[in-house]
From Swiss-Prot:
Residues 1-43, 439-459 are annotated as: Disordered. Its main location: nucleus. One of its GO terms (biological process) is positive regulation of RNA splicing. This is Zinc finger protein ZPR1. Disruption phenotype: Die during early embryonic development. Embryos show growth delay, failed to form normal trophectoderm and to expand the inner cell mass. The keyword Magnesium does not apply.
Length: 459
C-alpha cells in the first residue's frame, strides 16, 4: 500500500481461484528463487481476487523470491482492469527475528539512491536532517529503492493537498515547502541520512559492495523492548523473577532421628534464631513420643571468633536469674564462691536463662549415679548436699556470687539488661587464645590460605 493511503489487495477469503495459466505451469526447483530477470522459470502465481475499490474481480500476483545476502520474501502485486486500481507490497516469508535491526545509511550519490530496500510493515523510516519520520504500521511493506521510499512519501503528502489549500491554506503551504525539501533530496542537493529501524529484524538495505564492508551503511542489532514485542504481537517475556532466598529465621525445619534414650524414631526441630546484640545460633530440640524424653541443644551459627571471650557476672539480685544465656559447647563455667568449675562440652550447647543453666548444673551433680546408693562415700555425699544448698541459695537470690563463662571460641553470650549501655555488674573480656586452647579447638593444624599447594601427596 502506498503512502497515499491506497487500499491493499483483497483478503485471502475473497480469492476466486488460480488462473488456467498458473495451473498449467507447475513449480519446479526451489520454492524461493533469487530475484533475477534472467530466470525464466521464476514466474508469479496469479490469483483472481476482489478489488476493494470497485468491488469487482481483479488479479493478485504473488512472487516468492530471495533477496541476495538477506532472506526470503513474498512480493504481492494487485491490479484491477475495471477501475485501474493497482497496489504492490511485500511480506516477510520468514519468522520474526530474535533481534531488531537498525540500518543507518549516509546517502551521498545517485548510486546510494538506487540501493535496493526491503521495508516491512513494522519498520520506522527517519530522515534526521528534515526531522521526518514514517511511523511503523502506517504503510504496507515494500520492495523498493531509497529513491522509491522518498517518492512514496511525497505521493502520500501530495494526496490531500488540493483539499488543504481550500480549507487550511497555511498548513498546505508548509506541507508544500516540506515536499520541496524531499524533492531536493531526490536531486541529491546535499547528503542526508536515512534510518530504517525494524523491531522484527526483517527489513533490509542493500550493500552494493557485498561481501566487502560498506562504509556508508551502519547495521545495528538490538534486543526488543517489551513495548516493541507487544507491537509485533509477541508475548513479552516476563522478566525473570529473582528466586527469593529462603528465610530460615521464620521457619522451623524438621528431620528424623533416633531418641538417645530408647532409640525409637523421633523428630528433631531446628530453627535459626538471631540473638539481640550478638549473632545467629541454631537451636535444635528433640521430643520422643515413645518414652517422653526431651532434649535441646544450641549450635553456633558462625565461625570461631578471632579472640576468646570471658564473661563475669556478679549476681546481686534475683532478677539476674532471668538473663538470657547462650552457652556453646566450647564454653566452661566457674562459680568461685563454690569452688566449682564445669568443663567444656559438659551439658553441650544451651540457650536458656541463668536460672535454667544453674538448675541443670544442680541436677547434673546431685543425680550422678556414682554419688547415690549405699556404696557412696558419706563425706562426698555431704559435700554434694552442701553444694546443692548453696547453689539453691544463689538461684533464690539469697547468696551473692560470681558467675564466669569462659569460651575460647568466643561464641557464648550473657544478656546485658542495660544494653546498649554497659552493665555495671557484668564484665566482658576479649583475650588471645593460648596454644593449648587452639589445640583443643583444632585450629593449630588448620591451613586457611594457600592450602591448594599442599593437596598433592608427597612421595
Amino acid at each position: 500500500m502506498s503512502a497515499s493511503g491506497a487500499v491493499q489487495p483483497g483478503h485471502p477469503g475473497a480469492a476466486v481461484g488460480p488462473s488456467p495459466a498458473a495451473a498449467a505451469s507447475p513449480a519446479t526447483g526451489p520454492l524461493f528463487r533469487p530475484l533475477s530477470a534472467e530466470d525464466e522459470e521464476q514466474q508469479p502465481t496469479e490469483i483472481e481476487s476482489l478489488c476493494m475499490n470497485c468491488y469487482r474481480n481483479g488479479t493478485t500476483r504473488l512472487l516468492l523470491t530471495k533477496i541476495p545476502f538477506f532472506r526470503e520474501i513474498i512480493v504481492s502485486s494487485f491490479s484491477c482492469e475495471h477501475c485501474g486500481w493497482n497496489n504492490t507490497e511485500i511480506q516477510s516469508a520468514g519468522r520474526i527475528q530474535d533481534q531488531g535491526v537498525r540500518y543507518t545509511l549516509t546517502v551521498r550519490s545517485q548510486e546510494d539512491m538506487n540501493r535496493e530496500v526491503v521495508k516491512t510493515d513494522s519498520a520506522t523510516t527517519r530522515i534526521p536532517e528534515l526531522d521526518f519520520e514514517i511511523p511503523a504500521f502506517s504503510q504496507k511493506g515494500a520492495l523498493t529503492t531509497v529513491e522509491g521510499l522518498i517518492s512514496r512519501a511525497i505521493s502520500g503528502l501530495e494526496q490531500d493537498q488540493p483539499t488543504r489549500r481550500a480549507v487550511e491554506g497555511a498548513i498546505a503551504e508548509r506541507i508544500d515547502e516540506f515536499i520541496g525539501k524531499l524533492k531536493d533530496l531526490k536531486q541529491m542537493a546535499s547528503p542526508f541520512t536515512l534510518v530504517i529501524d525494524d523491531p522484527s529484524g526483517n527489513s533490509f538495505v542493500e550493500n552494493p559492495h557485498a561481501p566487502q564492508k560498506d562504509n556508508a551503511l551502519v547495521i545495528t542489532y538490538y534486543d526488543r523492548t517489551p513495548q516493541q514485542a507487544e507491537m509485533l504481537g509477541l508475548q513479552a517475556e516476563a522478566p525473570e523473577e529473582k528466586a527469593e532466598e529462603e528465610d530460615l529465621r521464620n521457619e522451623v525445619l524438621q528431620f528424623n532421628t533416633n531418641c538417645p534414650e530408647c532409640n525409637a524414631p523421633a523428630q528433631t526441630n531446628m530453627k535459626l534464631v538471631q540473638i539481640p546484640h550478638f549473632k545467629e545460633v541454631i537451636i535444635m530440640a528433640t521430643n520422643c513420643e515413645n518414652c517422653g524424653h526431651r532434649t535441646n541443644e544450641v549450635k553456633s551459627g558462625g565461625a570461631v571468633e578471632p579472640l576468646g571471650t570471658r564473661i563475669t557476672l556478679h549476681i546481686t539480685d534475683p532478677s539476674d536469674m532471668t538473663r538470657d544465656l547462650l552457652k556453646s559447647e566450647t564454653c566452661s563455667v566457674e562459680i568461685p564462691e563454690l569452688e566449682f568449675e564445669l568443663g567444656m562440652a559438659v551439658l553441650g550447647g544451651k540457650f536458656t536463662t541463668l536460672e535454667g543453666l544453674l538448675k541443670d548444673i544442680r541436677e547434673l551433680v546431685t543425680k550422678n549415679p556414682f554419688t547415690l546408693g549405699d556404696s557412696s562415700n558419706p563425706d562426698q555425699s555431704e559435700k554434694l548436699q552442701e553444694f546443692s544448698q548453696k547453689l539453691g541459695q544463689i538461684i533464690e537470690g539469697k547468696m551473692k556470687a560470681h558467675f564466669i563463662m569462659n569460651d575460647p571460641a568466643g561464641n557464648s553470650y550473657l544478656q546485658n539488661v542495660y544494653a546498649p549501655e554497659d552493665d555495671p555488674e557484668m564484665k566482658v573480656e576479649r583475650y588471645k587464645r593460648t596454644f593449648d586452647q587452639n589445640e583443643e579447638l583444632g585450629l593449630n593444624d588448620m591451613k586457611t590460605e594457600g592450602y591448594e599447594a599442599g593437596l598433592a601427596p608427597q612421595r
